[in-house]
């Protein structure tokens, strides 16, 4: 069937901010879909609230709306677009594609249909029909559908109250699994082992489910879990793209499981039965066009197979299957949605076979999740049906062993394999209960002499996987006995074929530091043991592959032919994590696009399956490899073996490539852009302090310390409060504001493991300062300031966790001039080539430099979207020797910033509190947000309100505000309270705060603090009497009392504001939303006339 010519315009719904359970994979799928639809000649309109995505780049759609993903805003966008279509005189149809934006887009599509909005504007849903979405997503309808086609499902009941849930659980017996309907990443789900746990989880699940219902399901804990990625077209052709096996058993969310493709432990007969079942599911649910994933559980004792669930959309597993096979699922799903059939679409990798050929792979792929519980003290680390990982890595090897070991070293835990802190007495508990360190305990169990059978019994992992892990452990032990001087080339080759790194071998032989690793490398290369590169080609080498997509292995035949083009290798940012997210991937992609346009061969190195950077057509050559010194050097040597000229970019991938920069340069790699020495100078406390003195630029008083005594003496000299942190970290990892000596000594005892032989930094903390972020471009001669962003939270809250606004709203002109002056001086003194990010604190109109990062920062995508100038593209061109005068001559001549026209752009962070209900929500110098959103309007208040709405904080337009502010903030309290009273709010306050308000003649109801008596403030929150909380904590004493308030607020989903500055911004936002109807503007219109390509 050819493409549908009756459709003229297609709205693609994005997935919004990055949250746990919905990550960068939807930027990758949305980008592919937009490109495919635009290439087919459709008018493409995109809506998404996340500025850090490639899909929101203005060139990917005809109109791009960065707006909140709510029914109200989509109604307005659909109205405008439907009117434009009607006015154009075209009789073409208007369609919405909701299957590439994750759960967010699907839920929105259902809401728009149910509210009659799609019918109102004559809009058709494509990619998935409404009844198919409902059948797959509604637990009861799905269960009935499976029963109708004769497939087994776990016994279950759909409940909408706790009594029915208890009744059913008692009937089928504990434990039971609780799964809320229409939620993402298993939000609100859990395992109830008894009545109390069931009641607690069910109450939370019913609250989080948009339709207030949960499925209570018979436990299949310990069963094996499989997924099939399936595609179907309108002619009923169905193909299986990939089978995926979870190494962890049922009971752990698939996003938190180690997964392997293709499935390793199925017999052919079992696989065929599962394949047949998946085809039946697709047809019964009615997914006519596009990709879905179907999840199965198999009882290892009896072989009973049950269907667990299906997603009628492109999912996290689709991204993995896509990268594992080279088959562009999202692109093909978009083409199927507009009427093509699989046999009409060519396979982009081979360019000889159609898409209806099922991919075949002759290698093994392993995905391992990345968790960051260290960011959330108090969070429950046990893994269950609710997803908790923040990112993932993928590795490809010729065997399972090789791909597992490569994936483990891609994780960048900062801890060496073999150096984990293990507690022998907790071995049994750690094997039985799934948690992030479980694999380390499995290896430890084998070192302690436990058998595969015993470990399989405790972990419910398939013995096949455990035998593989035991073989790796045994090989490492044997090679350790062989010593460095006596090891044979055969033993060494065997270890390398298993994926064991040089660093691990050095450790086994007791060779320390970088020199030890270099010795192993020399020995290995002396024996001629070097990696070769194999192709990912979708067809197990049966056809020629046209796209160079490689992975390393220690075999004989190399499939990566050398080229003699001028090339640039871009080091990616590895797994998504807090502090280093999709923003850095965005910069890497832009570098690849610009370099390709300029005639360079762009080579990408990364190991994250969720991102656009690892898409087969982003760069000219893609190496899916770990970002370690060994792996990166091997690629560089391979690419330059024939004498080809290759530069390497390290400033776009966040901290990961920067940590390798100096060692790469010492090994002879040509690093382009800002030199590793300059990067080091900016990070090194003493040298940087000297530079600031020479330039006469003030910074907060600071010192360094390597012991508790030194730290206490320094803090005393500088004066409390102090900011204590390790050197060389990203995302404010392990930072704290200390108000007294006890806090400093506690920190020093905790922090030493992060310092990597580098000292702890102690700074005077500037209280009540306004923080400012600056992004600038520099070519060594000229500097152009891209944006001066004013933070809405005060200094001391990590810049990644603070909302910020461009242009700055209330900084004095002379302060802005000082910031510009300091920025230019520092960029030129540090010899920056490319991007630089500076952070300033302004206290009583005096400007202090907090830090300078001569690299791309997480604000680059946001500033690029706000100014219409692709900063990362220009920066990568500067690195190849081009000059700013070619791109921004007017700004150089006038000295002006890039500017944002007549609009305000507010960036707000998004937090994962609902996944970690036990964690305190107060913000500080350590970053905790997982993603970001942007609000755009012609006034600050509306832009802030939009950003808050996109981040999931719905500011109330009326009701009661609870105030509890510390003594220091009481001066600002009265005018703030008046603002809220003028907006029509009532005020409730704690005793001290209420007294201040009464004195000023403001009416406020007084309420008990948590420890003072009942009914206290937490009772009011739980009784839904409070609509907004303004609670500014200070120091340790008040901290615990307020933790209870903030926790209760998270559970009741009441917006909580912890700084006076943000409370003022919220008041402006509420005023804007009370004032007028909503406005929406596409980026293309905002930047018409001044965008730079």
Swiss-Prot record:
Span list, region Oligomerization domain: 413-560
Entry binding sites for ATP 2: 725, 764, 766, 771, 796-799, 839, 851
Keyword tags: Amino-acid biosynthesis, Arginine biosynthesis, ATP-binding, Ligase, Magnesium, Manganese, Metal-binding, Nucleotide-binding, Pyrimidine biosynthesis, Repeat
Binding, Mn(2+) 1: 295, 309
Co-factor remark: Binds 4 Mg(2+) or Mn(2+) ions per subunit.
Region feature Carboxyphosphate synthetic domain, mapped onto this chain: 1-412
Binding-site positions, Mg(2+) 3: 839, 851
InterPro entries: ATP-grasp, ATP_grasp_subdomain_1, CarbamoylP_synth_lsu, CarbamoylP_synth_lsu_oligo, CarbamoylP_synth_lsu_oligo_sf, CbamoylP_synth_lsu-like_ATP-bd, CbamoylP_synth_lsu_CPSase_dom, MGS-like_dom
Segments forming domain ATP-grasp: 143-338, 689-880
Residues that coordinate or bind Mn(2+) 2: 309, 311
Top-rank lineage group of the source organism: Bacteria
Region spans: Carbamoyl phosphate synthetic domain: 561-952
Signal peptide: none
Binding residues annotated for Mg(2+) 2, in chain numbering: 309, 311
Binding site for ATP 1: 139, 179, 185-186, 218, 220, 225, 251-253, 295, 309
Enzyme Commission number(s): 6.3.4.16, 6.3.5.5
GO cellular component: a single term: cytoplasm
Protein role: Large subunit of the glutamine-dependent carbamoyl phosphate synthetase (CPSase). CPSase catalyzes the formation of carbamoyl phosphate from the ammonia moiety of glutamine, carbonate, and phosphate donated by ATP, constituting the first step of 2 biosynthetic pathways, one leading to arginine and/or urea and the other to pyrimidine nucleotides.
Name listed for the protein in its UniProt record: Carbamoyl phosphate synthase large chain
